[in-house]
Amino acid sequence: MQVTETQKEGLKRAYTITVTAAELDAKVQEKLVEAQPDIEMKGFRKGKVPLAMLKKQFGPRLLGDAMQDAIDGAMRDHLETSGDRPAMQPEVRMVDGETWKEGTDVVVEMKYEALPEIPEIETSKVSLERLVVKADEAAIEEALKNLAESAQNFEDRRKGSKAKDGDQVVIDFKGSVDGELFEGGSAEDYPLVLGSGSFIPGFEEQLVGTKVDDEVTVKVSFPAEYGAKHLAGKEAEFACTVKAVKAPKAAELDDELAKKYGAEDLAALKSQISERLEAEYKGASRAVLKRALLDQLDQMVSFELPSKLVEAEAHQIAHQLWHEEHPEEHGHNHGNIEPTDEHKALAERRVRLGLLLAEIGRKAEVTVTDAEMTQAVLAQARQYPGQERAYFEFVQKNPQIQQQLRAPIFEDKVVDLILEGATVTEKEVGKDDLQKAIEALDEM
């Protein structure tokens, strides 16, 4: 077996691998000997079938396996000897693949881009500022007020009062399309909060200003993308009778409200809110700190990037942003989305930082534990209530999904490792300052 280098330019590598006919035949023979003890054939006892007969019957089938084993072995030996780590799966092409005949040498061309040498960084030269926000009384009171509004009740307005935006109207209604009532279009004593957006666009607005005992014909058009296809885009009329008009009344800030949210009393609820707010502030502060760290790391290192990785990342960015700008397009049945220079620049940054963090983690032997993976899978599974078991099985069968869950955990552990050696000072700020810092992340 012979491996000949045909290209070595920057990170680009190309080789010709030659497996001689004799080596290939020896591989086939090896597989036949390995299989012989388990093969039965008419006229022979199990394991006693002559190799010549086995080769005649099973040789063509084993030839492909032997060829693949030989090529894989040559590639593996080459990578171990050279120390190269391909950035992506090597491209392998069999020369004369369509015209190759048994008894001749197998010649394969292999191409790949090697991962670059990643320079060491001195974490002690990294200097960062961590924003610290305390949960003050005003923030706690604001959160309490929001909880009270979420737990609000509705009380009847004075007789003859007109419904306002935010009020609850209790209505009977019958919906029709082309003069015919349609299934699911009627209800009695239905409580509808005006302005909630829970009904078809334009419906709730036509009930603002109504009073008890008013009879109103609401005219609307079903959205073109409405779930019930037989109604999508159709004009409809709803005959409505207003039976009650109620004003919202926020719940009292007392122990009863606290018990609704699982706390023993109001003081305990305030304590829970304080802890939750500080956890939120801490998470937001970490996001700002991590971005600042990545910005510094990006300025500290410079090395050649595998062009194929950058190209793949740029296309992924362009594709993702296109779908964010076209949320109505759920599939991938669209033309090629060409990355812009901005996409390519962002891709280069992501690839550079990704390779740097991966190398730091590799050298420090950072790993993601089974317990950490289980927690990540559990967190994702909660998004599919009632289908948790199916999601677990889906993850178990998909290494790519496992890697998608593992990658951010690994990255955060490497970030923590770097922060341990960096100089990090704390700066106490208000929540508005933290919010501005978070908003600035989205603009970058």
Curated annotation (Swiss-Prot):
Its EC number is 5.2.1.8. Pfam families: FKBP_C (PF00254), Trigger_C (PF05698), Trigger_N (PF05697). One of its GO terms (biological process) is protein folding. It comes from the Bacteria. Residues 166-251 form the PPIase FKBP-type domain. It is an enzyme of class 5 (isomerase). It is found in: Cytoplasm. GO terms for cellular component: cytoplasm. Its main location: cytoplasm. One of its GO terms (molecular function) is peptidyl-prolyl cis-trans isomerase activity. Belongs to the FKBP-type PPIase family. Tig subfamily. This is Trigger factor. It comes from Cereibacter sphaeroides (strain ATCC 17023 / DSM 158 / JCM 6121 / CCUG 31486 / LMG 2827 / NBRC 12203 / NCIMB 8253 / ATH 2.4.1.).
